[in-house]
Regions:
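Conserved lysine of the Walker
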Residues: 73
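Hydrophobic positions on the alpha1 helix immediately C-terminal to the Walker A/P-loop
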Residues: 76, 80
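Hydrophobic anchor at the beta1->P-loop junction of P-loop NTPases
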Residues: 65
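NTP-dependent small-molecule kinase module
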Residues: 2-10, 14-15, 20, 200-275
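P-loop (Walker A) phosphate-binding loop of NTP-binding proteins
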Residues: 68
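A glycine- and Lys/Arg-enriched "phosphate-lid" helix/loop adjacent to the NTP-binding pocket
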Residues: 150-225
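Conserved substrate/cofactor phosphate-moiety recognition/catalytic segment
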Residues: 82-126, 153-154
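Extreme N-terminal, non-catalytic leader segments
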Residues: 2-15, 19-22, 26-27, 41-61
Length: 275
């Protein structure tokens, strides 16, 4: 098992390096592969990596992109989705908007005291599905996780007095059972650290129907919880190393940050101490 895991990690590392050779990024010393072969080699390495994974029972890497509403998670996922060896899973928002004809997300924003528990129960279910579905690539990048659903959004409802303690306890019991009995582990959290003010401006510009009534106070509360959880690490146990990327900048600078951190993001096995 250990031998297969080590081989898997090495192959993933080479896949990431080869994928970069056609870009302006510097090549590793002695690494001279014609650009025309890059894509073929990446596909070959990915195929071999998956084969090693299946034969040796190795677990592939799961990277979760975390951050406030409108912090830039979709932009991050879209950027790395261009990498051949990555499976990208966005938040299942469409499911939350249409549960057999019911828009749970919209109902929650309209009356969180009434619909908070209903939405968060369904979110926990759909995020569990995201974590446990079979992996089709060596790397899976997820938009948020079952961990942030509980530690950020459920916690916010409870702290703000919009979720009764009994509902909070039931969701906590479910979450603890899930984490003990299913594999929802994470190898790396990429935290897009963004000010509530920036998120609020982006929120207004993207004009999503359900988000029109989101107040600055809500974004500030979510930001505070993320800071407690991932930066101060005083809220709940953090399930993996954390890589912090400042995401208040304009689009071009943020993309430059992604490129600067590409190797650290795509080889999470090497991330021992990110903070």
């Amino acid at each position: 098992m250990e031998r297969g895991s080590a081989l898997l990690k090495r192959m993933l590392w080479w896949g990431v390096r080869i994928g970069r050779c056609g870009s302006s990024s510097p090549k590793p010393a002695g690494f001279g592969i014609p650009q025309v072969l890059n894509q073929t080699l990446v596909i070959l390495i990915v195929t071999l990596t998956i084969t090693v994974h299946m034969r040796h029972g190795c677990r592939c890497a799961v990277i979760c992109v975390e951050g406030n509403i409108a912090s830039g998670k979709t932009t991050c996922l879209d950027y790395f989705a261009k990498t051949s060896s990555i499976e990208v899973l966005t938040e299942p928002v469409l499911k939350w908007r249409n549960v057999r004809g019911h828009n749970l997300l919209g109902l929650m924003y309209q009356d969180s005291s009434r619909w908070g528990i209903t939405l968060q129960t369904y979110i926990q279910l759909t995020m569990l599905d995201q974590h446990t579905r079979p992996m089709i690539s060596p790397l899976r990048m997820m938009e948020r996780s079952i961990h942030s659903a509980k530690h950020i959004f459920v916690e916010n409802l409870y702290r703000s007095g919009k979720m009764p303690e009994v509902d909070y306890v039931v969701l906590t019991e479910w979450f603890e059972w899930i984490t003990k009995n299913t594999n929802v582990s994470v190898d790396l959290i990429v935290y897009l650290q963004t000010s509530p003010e920036t998120c609020y401006e982006r929120l207004k510009n993207r004009c999503r129907e359900e988000e029109k009534i989101i107040a600055m106070e809500y974004l500030e509360a979510i930001h505070q919880l993320y800071e407690e959880w991932l930066i101060k690490q005083t809220l709940f146990k953090v399930p993996s190393p954390v890589l912090v990327i400042q995401a208040d900048n304009d689009m071009q600078k943020i993309i430059e940050k992604y490129e600067e951190n590409r190797d650290r993001i795509l080889t999470p096995y090497n991330m021992q101490h990110c903070l």
